């Protein structure tokens, strides 16, 4: 690009990985580093990241992350971030505290929105009111009330975040590995230490770290870069001279052989719930080839239960599961292995068992086909960039990471040459030597033993008020446009299956949908279990490990799952599907059909190997669900409560909720693995041989031609299949339930049935952002709260909430308050813009493929989507007040479900008809 006044050009380079050009600049006055990623992506992104290095466990940088978004000089309102959530078209809007940096990114497809958001973010980080308003610190960080109780948004968030044994184990491991550097501290904050943070220290830390020469700014996508740089210089950077000393990270002397023991407090300590973590340093961050090699090596040796190293360790029967973790984003990357579900005696044998297993792998040599499969899989993922984060947000985070550790914000955006180099080294023993060097030092070790819990304190927080955010160029409903139509699909019959094709370029997405309308409700959990055990099972021609290797070699991603979808019309049926979802390059289509058929049809569900796999997988699933109840209790409560009101949620709860947890516990207690295998075999045959099959292809016309020739000779061909039918099951009467979990926080949910009306999404946004945010989050101290309206139900929820009864009382008062409010034209405009923007959020190709398939099965047409959009845009004050007035009766007919602490549940008394300890 052309030279822009005020900046020094460091370099410009082509970047095929980003489909565009990278430009690195330094701002002359402030010393800020800027990365421009210029390409044709309309989902434009911005990010500003600061190096933030904790020196204690007070969570000061986490509190600052929250605080700077709570009002600034140009936008002097309590929560501009909240008001942006209401009225922006952003596809991503957030901030993140990492162990060594804090990043403020957003993405939006709208140019006016981009300029507004960029100015709000820059004013927030460089001119926050929190530096002169102590109330912000107390609200977002911590405060003590007159009765001595402690609260605050971050304080309460971290009580929940650190409630799980995994979080406590991780923090202890990091302290043991990094006793002398920033990485040894809890960057999010430990509740026991947060109270030691003073307002004066908070101010000092901000001034030292939130300087322009300690930041990296990223601009990504299709935009006028020169215009954005001029705004940066004119309004912010030119006013910020360089500081004398920029904060720096220090390197930790490695700590091999360190051993730590710690308790984990739980309501029901069991001798077989011990965990043991082992960790090693993996080399220098700047050596990106080595770190990518570590990632590939670990996936090859530990990626599945049948991978050589993990299989050998599981065979020792030291515990129920072994997890692997690898973090290459820090100055000193690390890997860790965690043994779960062990006894104290077996946990102490873990380190020697790892040493022996590594030596055995080295003695035999690492199988080349495993390395190739893992390398191919990693390379496909780097091209596809799966997940929900917009590409520009990922680039902003990666730019901040590379800049922080090497001074080069573009370092992590180049990967093609790394993959090529590693591919050339596969046959020369490079990976064997890498494995040897990784595990040669004695590991850092942490042993975690369960014991009875400490008593938790009750907490609460004070009330605050708010004003309206005034933007230079606010969005209006007129800016929204008509919405882009989805690509039209075409169907045809091939080999007894319906083939649905949507045109797309790039990677192929191939989905096989088997109708489950004929399946009895009590059999659904078995099918869900089937989707989880397929990776563990042999076929007549391949071992499980061989088949996993082939799938990784030829496919980008492959998974089997259950889908439950319901249309938008009132009384619309539920469509239940057993789904195999594959992503691949077009040249691999034949292999995809062959491998997918073998994997789905030929895995052996009976015999000793299958029975051992069942016991292993069920134990692992049970452990994982117990962790998730503590971390995501609101999600489990919502699906549990919603199951009383529609079939889709009833099926989801049966296959992924508390009912499924009970199903797992029952199977583990019975341990009839032969009977389980026979049951799964019968169900699989019933579905795969007889259920209607729809094959969805998102790809080119040429790929469709190839698929037409492949299906008739494949396992998916059938002469005759049953007609599809809606899935149905009887709904159970509503019951108010509480589930007691470990930890000092609660998740309160209230659900009620409601007709499907798109315009109620505006009401949900008013409730979420005008009422609940203030009363539950700011006053009550919960980390999260909101209202959702979808799928024939509506619900209110809290997340990591110090309260329970008080939150339900707040829920009950909401309808009257919303009905009594006056809504200005600007209020309605902002709410409608935010609601409609959710319809236009850009999706990545895989997500777009799945959404188009959902629309096909549910009969969702362009006319329906246009009608939804029109209804949202037509909401007026009278309609909103009418909906709010009717909400109280609707809520009263609903149900309450809570996941929470014993103290809170017992204090709630008569709120619940049934209480269970999980």
Regions found by a protein language model. Give the residues of each.
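Non-catalytic terminal extensions that flank enzyme cores
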Residues: 1-45
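His/Glu-based metal-binding/catalytic segments typifying zinc-dependent metallopeptidases
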Residues: 37-40, 47-49, 155, 159, ...
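M16 family metallopeptidases and their MPP-like homologs
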Residues: 43-53, 79-127, 134-140, 167-192, ...
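Active-site recognition of the HExxH zinc-binding catalytic motif
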Residues: 58-70, 524, 528-532
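Non-catalytic, conformational "gating/processing" segments within enzyme and secreted inhibitor domains
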Residues: 200-235, 652, 657, 676-711, ...
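Extended, domain-scale alpha-helical bundle/helix-rich regions
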Residues: 427-454
């Amino acid at each position: 690009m052309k030279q822009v006044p005020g900046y020094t050009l460091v370099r410009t380079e082509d970047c095929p990985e980003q489909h565009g050009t990278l430009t690195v600049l330094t701002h002359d006055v402030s010393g800020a580093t800027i990365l421009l990623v210029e390409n044709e992506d309309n989902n434009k992104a911005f990010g500003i990241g600061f190096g933030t290095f904790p020196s204690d466990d007070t969570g000061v940088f986490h509190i600052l992350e929250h605080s700077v978004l709570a009002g600034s000089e140009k936008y002097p309102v309590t929560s501009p971030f909240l008001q942006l959530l209401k009225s922006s078209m952003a596809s991503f809007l957030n901030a993140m505290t990492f162990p060594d940096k804090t990043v403020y990114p957003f993405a939006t497809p709208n140019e006016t929105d981009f300029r507004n958001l960029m100015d709000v973010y820059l004013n927030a980080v460089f001119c926050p009111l929190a530096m002169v308003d102590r109330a912000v610190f107390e609200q977002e960080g911590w405060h003590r009330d007159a009765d001595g109780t402690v609260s605050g948004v971050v304080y309460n968030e971290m009580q929940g975040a650190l409630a799980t044994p995994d979080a406590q184990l991780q923090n202890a491991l990091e302290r043991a590995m990094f006793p002398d550097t920033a990485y040894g501290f809890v960057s999010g904050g430990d509740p026991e230490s947060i109270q030691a943070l003073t307002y004066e220290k908070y101010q000092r830390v901000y001034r030292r770290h939130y300087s322009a020469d300690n930041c990296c700014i990223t601009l990504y996508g299709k935009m006028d870069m020169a215009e954005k740089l001029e705004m940066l210089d004119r309004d912010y950077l030119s006013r910020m001279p360089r500081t004398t000393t920029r904060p720096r990270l220090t390197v930790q002397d490695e700590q091999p052989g360190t051993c730590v023991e710690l308790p984990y407090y739980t309501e029901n300590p069991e001798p077989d719930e011990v965990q043991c973590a082992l960790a090693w340093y993996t080399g220098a961050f700047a050596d990106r080839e080595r770190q990518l090699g570590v990632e590939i090596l670990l996936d090859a040796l530990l990626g599945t239960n049948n991978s050589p190293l993990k299989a050998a360790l599981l065979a020792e029967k030291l515990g129920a599961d072994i997890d692997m973790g690898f973090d290459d984003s820090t100055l000193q990357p690390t890997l860790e292995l965690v043994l779960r579900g062990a006894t104290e005696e077996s946990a102490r044998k873990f380190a020697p068992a790892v040493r022996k297993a590594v030596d055995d792998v080295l003695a035999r040599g690492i199988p080349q086909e495993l390395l190739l499969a893992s390398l191919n899989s990693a390379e496909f993922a780097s091209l596809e960039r799966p997940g929900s984060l917009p590409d520009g947000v990922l680039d902003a985070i990666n730019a901040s990471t590379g800049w922080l550790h090497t001074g080069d914000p573009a370092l992590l955006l180049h990967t093609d040459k790394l993959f090529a180099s590693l591919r050339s080294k596969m046959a020369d023993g490079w990976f064997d030597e890498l494995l040897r060097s990784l595990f040669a030092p004695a590991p850092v070790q942490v042993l975690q033993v369960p014991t009875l819990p400490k008593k938790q304190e009750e907490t609460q927080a004070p009330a605050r008020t708010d004003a309206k955010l005034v933007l230079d160029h606010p969005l209006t409903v007129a800016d929204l446009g008509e919405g882009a139509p989805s690509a039209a699909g075409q169907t045809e019959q091939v080999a007894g299956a319906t083939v649905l094709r949507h045109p797309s370029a790039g990677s192929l997405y191939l989905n096989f949908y088997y109708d489950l309308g004929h399946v009895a409700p009590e059999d659904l959990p078995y099918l869900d279990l089937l989707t989880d055990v397929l990776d563990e099972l042999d076929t007549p021609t391949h071992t499980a490990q061989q088949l996993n290797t082939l799938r990784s070699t030829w496919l980008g991603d492959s998974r089997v799952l259950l889908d439950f979808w319901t249309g938008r019309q009132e009384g619309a049926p539920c469509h239940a599907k057993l789904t195999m979802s594959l992503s691949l390059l077009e040249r691999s289509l034949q292999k995809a059909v062959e491998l997918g058929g073998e994997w789905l049809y030929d895995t052996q569900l009976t015999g000793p190997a299958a029975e051992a796999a069942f016991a292993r997988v069920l134990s692992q699933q049970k452990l994982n669900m117990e962790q998730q109840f503590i971390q995501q209790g609101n999600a489990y409560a919502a699906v549990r409560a919603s199951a009383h009101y529609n079939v889709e949620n009833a099926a989801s709860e049966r296959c992924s909720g508390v009912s499924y947890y009970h199903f797992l516990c029952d199977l583990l207690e019975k341990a009839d693995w032969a009977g389980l295998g026979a049951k799964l075999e019968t169900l699989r045959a019933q579905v795969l041989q007889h259920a209607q099959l729809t094959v969805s292809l998102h790809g080119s016309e040429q790929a469709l031609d190839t698929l037409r020739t492949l299906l008739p000779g494949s396992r998916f061909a059938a002469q005759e299949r049953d007609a599809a039918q809606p899935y149905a099951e009887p709904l159970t009467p509503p019951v108010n339930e509480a589930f007691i979990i470990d930890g000092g926080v609660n998740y309160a949910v209230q659900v009620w049935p409601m007709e499907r009306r798109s315009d109620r999404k505006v009401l949900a946004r008013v409730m979420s952002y005008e009422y609940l945010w203030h009363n539950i989050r700011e006053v009550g101290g919960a980390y999260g709260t909101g209202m959702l309206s979808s799928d024939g139900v509506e619900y209110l929820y809290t997340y990591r909430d110090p309260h329970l009864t008080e939150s339900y009382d707040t829920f009950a008062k909401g309808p009257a308050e919303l009905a009594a409010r006056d809504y200005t034209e600007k209020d309605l405009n902002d709410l409608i813009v935010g609601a409609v923007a959710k319809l236009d959020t850009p999706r990545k190709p895989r997500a777009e493929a799945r959404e188009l398939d959902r629309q096909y099965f549910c009969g969702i047409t362009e006319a329906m989507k246009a009608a939804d959009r029109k209804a949202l845009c037509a909401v007026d004050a009278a309609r909103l007040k009418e909906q709010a007035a009717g909400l109280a009766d609707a809520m009263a007919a609903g149900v309450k479900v809570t996941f929470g602490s014993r103290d809170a549940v017992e204090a709630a008394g008569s709120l619940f008809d049934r209480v269970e300890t999980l």
